C-alpha cells in the first residue's frame, strides 16, 4: 500500500474517531439539556395549583410509608413519596379555600419515623385549621397505614380491607455462623461496649427491646386518641 493511501486511511480514521467522540459528547449534552428542560417543565406542573373555589384535598397514602426515594421529577418510580405528601398537606393548611381532606390509605405500613411524622402532620392540619379529615381504607391500612388512618374524623373501609396490625418490629440477620464457615472474621474497634452490635449481647437485646416497647406504647396511645379508647382497650385488641 502506498504511503499516501496509508496516510489517507490514518487521517480518515482520526476524523471518524473525532467525529464519533464529538457525536457522543453532543448527544450527552443534548440529553442533559433535555433532562434539565423537562425537569423545569415538570417542576412547574407539580406546583400547588388548587381550584379557585372551595374544595376537598385528596391525600393519597399508597405503598410503604418510608423515606422519600424519588430524587427527581424524572424518576417514574411509583409509591408513597413522603416529602411531597408532607409539603402538600402544608399547602392545604395555608389555603383558606380548602375545606377538608379525603385521606385515601392503601398501605401495609412502613417505618416508625415517617409513619408517626405523617400522623402528626395530619393532626397539625386538623388542629390548625379546624377542618375535618375523612379516611378511606382500601386494600390495606395496616400498621403505619392504620396509624395514619386514625386521624380521620370518619373512617370508612371496604369489606375486604386488611387493617390493624398494631405493633412494632425490629429485625436483622445473625451471619456469624456463615462468616465462621467461610473463614471471615469481623473486626471492629469502638469507643464503647454498646457501639458495635454485630454480636448482640443480652444487654444490647434489652436496649433494643426497650426501644421497640417505647414505640409500641406510642402507637397504642395514638390509636387510643384517634379511636376514643383507653390504652388498655387498644392493647386488648392489638394482642
Predicted ranges, named:
Residues 134-142, 237-239:
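Glycine-rich beta-to-alpha transition loops that act as phosphate-gripper elements at the mouths
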Residues 219-239:
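Secondary-structure end/capping motifs
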Residues 2-4, 12-129, 140-226:
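Small-residue-centered hinge/linker elements
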Amino acid at each position: 500500500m502506498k504511503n499516501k493511501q496509508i496516510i489517507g486511511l490514518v487521517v480518515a480514521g482520526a476524523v471518524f474517531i473525532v467525529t464519533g467522540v464529538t457525536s457522543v459528547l453532543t448527544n450527552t449534552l443534548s440529553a442533559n439539556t433535555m433532562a434539565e428542560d423537562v425537569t423545569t417543565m415538570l417542576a412547574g406542573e407539580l406546583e400547588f395549583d388548587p381550584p379557585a373555589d372551595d374544595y376537598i384535598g385528596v391525600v393519597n397514602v399508597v405503598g410503604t410509608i418510608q423515606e422519600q426515594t424519588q430524587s427527581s421529577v424524572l424518576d417514574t418510580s411509583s409509591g408513597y413519596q413522603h416529602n411531597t405528601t408532607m409539603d402538600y398537606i402544608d399547602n392545604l393548611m395555608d389555603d383558606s379555600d380548602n375545606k377538608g381532606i379525603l385521606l385515601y390509605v392503601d398501605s401495609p405500613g412502613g417505618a416508625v419515623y415517617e409513619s408517626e411524622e405523617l400522623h402528626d402532620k395530619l393532626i397539625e392540619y386538623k388542629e390548625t385549621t379546624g377542618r375535618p379529615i375523612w379516611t378511606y381504607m382500601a386494600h390495606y391500612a395496616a400498621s403505619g397505614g392504620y396509624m395514619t388512618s386514625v386521624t380521620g374524623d370518619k373512617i370508612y373501609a371496604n369489606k375486604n380491607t386488611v387493617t390493624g396490625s398494631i405493633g412494632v418490629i425490629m429485625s436483622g440477620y445473625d451471619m456469624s455462623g456463615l462468616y465462621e464457615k467461610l473463614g471471615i472474621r469481623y473486626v471492629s474497634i469502638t469507643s464503647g461496649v454498646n457501639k458495635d452490635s454485630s454480636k448482640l449481647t443480652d444487654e444490647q437485646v434489652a436496649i433494643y427491646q426497650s426501644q421497640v416497647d417505647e414505640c409500641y406504647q406510642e402507637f397504642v396511645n395514638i390509636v387510643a386518641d384517634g379511636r376514643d379508647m383507653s390504652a388498655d382497650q387498644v392493647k386488648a385488641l392489638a394482642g
